[in-house]
Amino acid sequence: MSRTLDYTKELIRRASVTPEDQGCQAWIIEKLEVLGFKCETLWFEEVRNLWARRGTQGPVFAFAGHTDVVPTGDVTAWKYDPFTPTEEGDLLYGRGAADMKGSIAAMIVAMEDFIAAHPDHNGSLAFLITADEEGPSVNGTVKVVEHLQARQEHIDYCLVGEPSSTNTVGDVIKNGRRGSLGAKLTVKGIQGHVAYPHLARNPIHDVAPALAELSATEWDQGNDFFPATSFQISNINGGTGATNVIPGTCEIIFNFRFSTELTDAILRERVEAILDKHGLDYDLQWTLSGQPFLTDRGALVDAAVGAIRDVTELDTELSTAGGTSDGRFIAPTGTQVVELGPTNATIHKVDEHTSISELDTLTQIYQRLLQHLMTTG
């Protein structure tokens, strides 16, 4: 029987819908303390976090992950109960199987086997686990990192167990992520009767040319590591629902996923210049969710690439595509960060599942990476 499978099931059974942990971290602590980890539970507001470390010297390698999962939606739409882990052939069904309780299980088993083989490993080993990744992400990893910085504790290498793989485990490593800058734009007009437009001002009509220009703008051309910056409108709301009323306001929500070619300050400046050019009366509220980051070829990326090749014979792809992750909070401290985890085809979906054999392969990759990075010779 696979320990990784057993551990994944233990975690899935705990219905830790964000920001709840439901005993996952207490169970993880039991496993890590046996291995000699000093475990600290860190509460920020009502969010539980875990920092566990084995050793006092550098370099420090940390596995990072989250015990919280997204809501299930309509449970009657699921093939099996989402919090009753169920095997079907080589597949394991359950909320969090792929994102990311399977990764955490693989991390623990890999660490058990690595420490058994290398009790006097180089440096220090660590885990950074949060229950606030799938939600607002304000009392999780970002606060743990701030806490560590305040006491001059630095992570040199960090592997985030997000489901990075596409078709088979290890085929893609995320060695960076685009930045995310969102905004809520409220354009003001004058409400009135549609039959008397001269007595009103339609904010939807006013903002339409500006939105067209924003959508057509080439913000940058990207670079060798990042695609071009993307601007997307996600919501437009205006009107009372009546057919004969010109609305008084229009609200637009949009988002940039931006490369290292730009800063969030440059994007804000360019957007506001376009809005001003079109003579709009507006309010604009910005939300910066994360800066872009990139971990270039170096000790961690090379160890991950080598481990994947050793275990699977795959030549992995380095990618910065996709959404944000908690890596965005860790990388700015100077930490080398990669994301490596299961395939992501069913994450956040009804009937989320992962391949049992891939979880075992992932465990081997994690263990091999530790050997590359934290042993001599």
Curated annotation (Swiss-Prot):
GO MF assignments: acetylornithine deacetylase activity; cobalt ion binding; succinyl-diaminopimelate desuccinylase activity; zinc ion binding
Active site, UniProt feature: 68, 133
Cofactor: Zn(2+); Co(2+)
Protein family membership: Belongs to the peptidase M20A family. DapE subfamily.
Record PANTHER family: ACETYLORNITHINE DEACETYLASE (PTHR43808), N-ACETYL-L-CITRULLINE DEACETYLASE (PTHR43808:SF31)
Annotated function: Catalyzes the hydrolysis of N-succinyl-L,L-diaminopimelic acid (SDAP), forming succinate and LL-2,6-diaminopimelate (DAP), an intermediate involved in the bacterial biosynthesis of lysine and meso-diaminopimelic acid, an essential component of bacterial cell walls.
Subunit structure: Homodimer.
Protein name: Succinyl-diaminopimelate desuccinylase
Organism the protein comes from: Alcanivorax borkumensis (strain ATCC 700651 / DSM 11573 / NCIMB 13689 / SK2)
